[in-house]
UniProtKB/Swiss-Prot annotation:
Source organism of the structure: Tityus serrulatus (Brazilian scorpion)
Name of protein: Putative potassium channel toxin Ts21
Domain of life per record: Eukaryota
Tissues/organs with expression: Expressed by the venom gland.
Signal peptide start-end: 1-25
Record remark: domains: Has the structural arrangement of an alpha-helix connected to antiparallel beta-sheets by disulfide bonds (CS-alpha/beta).
Its biological purpose: This recombinant toxin inhibits the mammalian voltage-gated potassium channels Kv1.3/KCNA3 in vitro with an IC(50) of 26.40 nM.
GO cellular component: extracellular region
GO molecular function, one term: potassium channel regulator activity
Length: 65
């Protein structure tokens, strides 16, 4: 009976992990935490002079020239 519970917990944990969005290799530049981190990211990587968090749930850093 303990093995059944162990398998059930294992299956549930795998399902929960599978529902989490995969982390893409593209850096977000501090988004969705703050626009200031995004701007700092843009300046330090020479992508632009300022930046702003945009997109759904403000999860993408858009660098502005």
């Amino acid at each position: 009976m303990n093995k059944v519970y162990l398998v059930a917990i294992l299956v549930l944990s795998v399902l929960l992990v599978a529902n989490v969005s995969p982390i893409e290799g593209v850096p977000t530049g501090g988004c969705p935490l703050s626009d200031a981190l995004c701007a700092k990211y843009c300046k330090s990587n020479k992508y632009g002079k300022t930046g702003k968090c945009t997109g759904t749930s403000k999860g993408t850093c858009k660098c502005l020239v």
